[in-house]
């Protein structure tokens, strides 16, 4: 039987994902692993939203979409546009690689008590003008602040820039953070 074990996931927990070929061995494998791991406090995990945001792990469809370029998402270093002959959008990617994006993913720290769920884009504002949007946010018990991922225009993406975030519970003061927390 083929098994694939991947050290991957959306947290700093250092877990593994196991993929089996065929479902008939899944339950037996599960029970065997849980029993063998019990003395070592091994258990099943799940994605951790807070750690995902603290670490700047982007969620496709939420923090980045097909509408974003790799450069906007901080992934430009993985694009080899010089050899991408025939690639649709190559010219645009070459231009952005040379000139830089006009907006980019940034870490944001939102002031105040815990924010509610970010179930829609929250506008990022400066003096009444929208300069970006928060796509993921959560209270971080480790850092005692609200951590967020947002797409911010280059005019306001420098670390320390003060902005306002229009949460569903009202306006919150925020600032662009130097980097993600973990």
Language-model features: where?
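Conserved, structured C-terminal
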Residues: 1-182
């Amino acid at each position: 039987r083929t098994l694939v074990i991947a050290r991957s996931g959306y947290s700093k927990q250092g877990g593994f994902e196991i993929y089996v070929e065929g479902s008939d061995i899944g339950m037996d494998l599960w029970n065997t692993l849980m029993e063998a791991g019990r003395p070592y406090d091994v258990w099943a995990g799940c994605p951790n939203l807070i750690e995902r945001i603290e670490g700047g792990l982007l969620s496709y469809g939420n923090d980045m979409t097909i509408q974003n370029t790799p450069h906007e998402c901080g992934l430009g270093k993985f694009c080899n546009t010089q050899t991408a002959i025939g690639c649709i959008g190559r010219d645009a990617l070459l231009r952005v690689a040379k000139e830089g994006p006009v907006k980019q993913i940034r870490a944001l720290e939102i002031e105040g008590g815990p924010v509610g769920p970010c179930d829609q884009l929250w506008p990022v504002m400066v003096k009444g003008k929208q300069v970006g949007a928060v796509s993921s946010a959560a209270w971080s018990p480790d850092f005692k602040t609200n951590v967020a991922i947002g797409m911010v225009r280059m005019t306001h993406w420098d670390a320390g820039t003060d902005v306002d975030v229009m949460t569903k519970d009202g306006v919150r003061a925020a600032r662009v953070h130097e980097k993600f927390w973990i």
